[in-house]
Amino acid sequence: MPDGFLGIPNGNDKELKMAQLSLKHIQKIYDNQVHVVKDFNLEIEDKEFIVFVGPSGCGKSTTLRMIAGLEEISAGELVIDGVCMNDVPAKSRDIAMVFQNYALYPHMTVYDNMAFGLKMQKIAPAVIEERVNWAAQILGLRDYLTRKPGALSGGQRQRVALGRAIVREAGVFLMDEPLSNLDAKLRVQMRAEISKLHQKLNTTMIYVTHDQTEAMTMATRIVILKDGVIQQVGAPKQVYNEPANMFVAGFIGSPAMNFIRGAIDDRYFVTETLRLEIPEDTLAAVNAAGYQRKAVVFGIRPEDILTLQSRGDDIAAKVSVAELTGAEFMLYATVGGHELVVRAGAVNDYAAGDNIGIQFDMNKCHFFDADTEVAIR
C-alpha cells in the first residue's frame, strides 16, 4: 500500500473539540427564486461522520457551504453547541473545510501550506510546528514537508489539504467531494484513510459526495437528498435494507434495485407475465396499508435474485448482457418482458443469449406505492 497513516499507532491520537450541530428548517432561495434547499432538518451528534449524498443539483454542497458560512441561510436556524451561527462569519465558526480542488499554494512547501492558516491567525511558531508535525505524522507526510505540491502525487496533495484542515483543531470538519479528482484505486485508499482519520481525531465530520459507495463505506449516518429535500436519514445498513422510497432504493446500491410495476392480488404480486407469492409478514403489512387489489411497484436487489439449475418451478430468463467483474457476474436479463439485473457468482459461466432459471428471494422484496413511490411497510 502507498505511504499513509493507516499503520500509525494509537499513541498519535489527539482528541479535538466537541461539536453538536442542529439544522432547523434550513432554506436556501436565490435571488432568481430558485429554491435549492427546502426545509432541511437534521441533528448531528458530536463525533458523528455524516455524509450528504445525492445527484448533482440536490443541494448537498449548498447545505455544506451554509454550515461553513460561505453561503447565507435564507431561512431557518443553524446551531452549533447551543449557539446560533446564522450571522457568525465563516472565520469565527470553528470549522475547517476541505474542497474538491486541493487549493494548495504551488510556491510553498508542504510545511508552509499546512502552516499558512495558523500563521495568519498569528499562532506562536512553536505551536504551529507542533501541530504541523503532529498532522504530518498522522497523514504520512513527515518525509514530504520540504517538498512543493508539484512534486507530490494526487493522493499526497489531498493529504496536504487534509493536513491544513487538521492543524486548525476545529470542532467540525467539512469535506466537499474531496476524492473526486483522484483515480479509482486512489479513491479506495483515501476512503479508508479518511475513515481512519475520523477515528483518530474523534471529531465531527460532514462529508459531501455524489458517490453512494463513498457514503455507504464511510458514514455513521447518511443523509440522502433529492431536489433540495431530505429523502431519508439513517445508518448505511438501514437505508440499504429499509429504503424510504423508490428514489433511495434506486440510488443506494450498485447495481440499483430492480423495479417491476404490478398489483397485489390476494397472496400474490402479479403482472401480465409474473405471479409471485408474498411472504406472510410482508403480505400483512401490505394488507394493513390497504393495497389489496391495488397497483404497486415490486422492488428486489440484484443479489436477491437467485440463479438455479432448472427444476421446473424456476422463472425463465434470457441473458442479454453478461458482465464479469471478477468474483461475480452482473447479468442483464429479460424476465417475462421485464428488464432485470441479477448478481450471480462466477462459479458458473454466463454469456449473452443464455436461457437461465431464476427465483426471487421474496423475503427480501420491497413494495412501493405506484403513485407516491413511498415504501409500503
Please place each PLM-identified region on the residue numbering.
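Conserved coupling/switch loops of ABC nucleotide-binding domains, chiefly the family-specific signature
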Residues: S74-E77, V127, D227, C365
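ABC ATPase nucleotide-binding domains
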Residues: A90-F247
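Conserved ABC transporter NBD signature motif
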Residues: G76-C84
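Helix-to-loop junction immediately C-terminal to a conserved catalytic motif
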Residues: A68
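The feature captures the beta-strand-to-loop junction immediately N-terminal to the Walker
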Residues: V53-P55
